[in-house]
Each structure stands twice: as C-alpha cells, then as structure tokens.
Amino acid sequence: MPPKKKQTAAAGKDRSKALELAMAQIEKDFGKGAIMRLGDDTRPPIQAISSGNIAINAALGIGGFPRGRVVEIYGPESSGKTTVALHAIAEAQRAGGIAAFVDAEHALDPEYARALGVDTDALLVSQPDTGEQALEIADMLIRSGAIDIIVVDSVAALTPKAEIDGDMGDSHVGLQARLMSQALRKMTGALYQTGTTAIFINQLREKIGVMFGSPETTTGGKALKFYASVRCDIRRIQALKDGQDVVGNRTRLKVVKNKVSPPFKIAEFDILYGEGISREGSIIDLGVETGLIKKSGSWFTYDGDQLGQGKEKAREFLKNNRDLSAELEDRIARELKIGPYAKMKDEQTEEAAGDQMDEDKPIDLSPNFDDDDAN
C-alpha cells in the first residue's frame, strides 16, 4: 500500500508542474491575465452607469446599467425606449464619461435630448446608411477604449446593404439576424475589456400563427437575446392628465433578463412630455413605498413637513427644493440598498448614514466611474 501512495503523490506533483508550465506558456503567448484561477481574480464588483432614475436603478439591482455588457431595451412604439437610453447618456456625461449615439432610425431630436440633460455638443452621433456601417462604427468606437456608453437606435433599422441595393419586394431571409450575430460575437469581448456599456434599442413584431403564449418577438434574430446581460421590456400603462390635457405617460419597465442581479423586478415611473422621466415622481413613489414619505389622504409628508396636497404639488415642491429631494433620494437608496449601498450590511448602511449626516450632504448616487474612466 505505501508505494502506491508515493506513486500517487509523485503523479500529482508532475501534473501540477505540467499545469504551471502550460499556464506560463499561455501567459507568454497571449499576455498576462489570459488564464488565472478564479480565486486569484481581484477585479472589483461590476460597475454601473446610472439610469438617472432611482426606480429603474432599483429594478436593475446594481444601481444602473452594467459596464462592459450588452443591454437590450425593447417595447411598443412610443413607450419610452429612447428616453430611457438618453437619460443614461446624460448620467454618463454628468460623471465625466463620453457617449455615442448610433441613430439608425435617423430620428434623434437634439432639442429633446438637451431637455433630458444630454450635452449635445459633446455627444458623438452617427447616422449610418447601412446596418453593416452602423455596427462597424460602433465596433470601432468600442475598441478605441474611450467610450463609456454607446446606444444603437434601433436594431430594426439596421438594414443590410444587400437589402438596400436590392429591389423592393426582394426576399432577404435571415440577413439581419446573421449581421447581428456576427457583430455581437466581435463586440462582446471588446465591451468587457473597455468597460463600455452598449444599449441596443429594439422594436416588437408579432409571430404569425401562434396559438399559445405571447405572439410578440423582437427583431434581429436570437443573438441579442443571448448576448444581452440585461433585457428590459418597457410599456405605457396609463396616460397622465392635467385636466383634459394628456401631459405624459405612466410607464412600466420589467427586467426580463438580468445576469448581474436577480431578474423580473419591475419599475413604474412617469414620463412627462418634453421633460423626460420624472425624477421627483419616482422619489415620491418609492418614498411612500419605503415609509419615508407618509401619505394621509391626498397629503404627502416627510419628517413632519408637508410636501403638498396631491402628487403634482408634491412633485413641484421637490423640484424647487433640490437639497431635500437629494436627501430623500439618498435615504431611499440606503433603504433599498441601491448604488453605493448595494453591498453594505445594515450596520454599515447606518454608519454611512451617520457619516453622511455629519458631512450634511447626500452621497453621489452614481459614483460608478473611476478617475481612469473619466479621463
């Protein structure tokens, strides 16, 4: 028996030595970090670019859209897809990042983007002629390593060159799906290496002859469904009225796929025409949900102070009192463990709250850019 143990130990040493030699050769050929033991990986947790809305950040789980990943936002027409993407661009720019917008639909409204907080002078915009050109431009921008977020609007408008050159009525089966599949194979590695967030906006179509289940599907084949780390389904659920006039939409966003946090969370928020997503409206909704804001009849109260009678008055009050709304947003983030509070335990959260009260200002809810990222 003892000789067998010695042989096993010797064989184990030989295998370990062979593995170390193989790993050394791999690192020599492909660079340091090409292979490692998972326990040796000291990368920080997944960083995020804030969506600009606390309800959406809570639904996404990590405080925003993940950096270095593919995100798909889809829904019916005029449901708020581009609005959500433009708010994310505005937040990235506010944190010192560089943003790009590939406008395949040729429908970007600079005035509306500016109203949402986008720095249109600094925003990189491309209006490509073909789908190949759009994805090639996106790939080159991502590989530059200088872009923090890139939005492609929309996948349905990425028309293959063969379809543009052909005659109306010609059949081009599967061209767009092949185009997306090839592009995403190339892009995903570059996105991870550069920490760029790629948001693909997509449209809905209906499958013919579906008897059971939803007939709805998205364009561009199945590749985007697989490569996306986050998929968001966005829908209008109600019209917001001021008297007889419709002033906006109540919107529901459901995270139907999430590889960085638990999926199937839902965010509801208001989109006001000409203004975008109402930050104050979401603060009121989540404030009531967490118990920080008390609602008695139609009155909203915070720490004994009345915010207003009715949601519109309370929204207006918070809009005119930025410090109070920032304080409330910070307390909600702490309560729901969003953004900088995501990984904290309860006692750490309370300690951070105490430190913050000493400094007498709320912490930045979108601190997901390192100094290196901002440069």
Swiss-Prot record:
ATP binds at G75, P76, E77, S78, S79, G80, K81, T82. The gene is recA. This is Protein RecA. SUPFAM superfamilies: P-loop containing nucleoside triphosphate hydrolases, RecA protein, C-terminal domain. It is found in: Cytoplasm. InterPro entries: AAA+_ATPase, DNA_recomb/repair_RecA, DNA_recomb/repair_RecA_CS, P-loop_NTPase, RecA-like_C, RecA-like_N, RecA_ATP-bd, RecA_C_sf. Belongs to the RecA family. Residues 339-375 are annotated as: Disordered. It comes from the Bacteria. GO terms for molecular function: ATP binding; ATP hydrolysis activity; ATP-dependent DNA damage sensor activity; damaged DNA binding; single-stranded DNA binding. It comes from Corynebacterium jeikeium (strain K411). Can catalyze the hydrolysis of ATP in the presence of single-stranded DNA, the ATP-dependent uptake of single-stranded DNA by duplex DNA, and the ATP-dependent hybridization of homologous single-stranded DNAs. It interacts with LexA causing its activation and leading to its autocatalytic cleavage. GO terms for biological process: DNA recombination; DNA repair; SOS response. Signal peptide: none annotated. GO terms for cellular component: cytosol. The keyword DNA-binding applies. Residues 348-358 have a biased composition (Acidic residues). It holds the Pfam family RecA. Disulfide bonds: none annotated. Keywords: ATP-binding, Cytoplasm, DNA damage, DNA recombination, DNA repair, DNA-binding, Nucleotide-binding, SOS response.
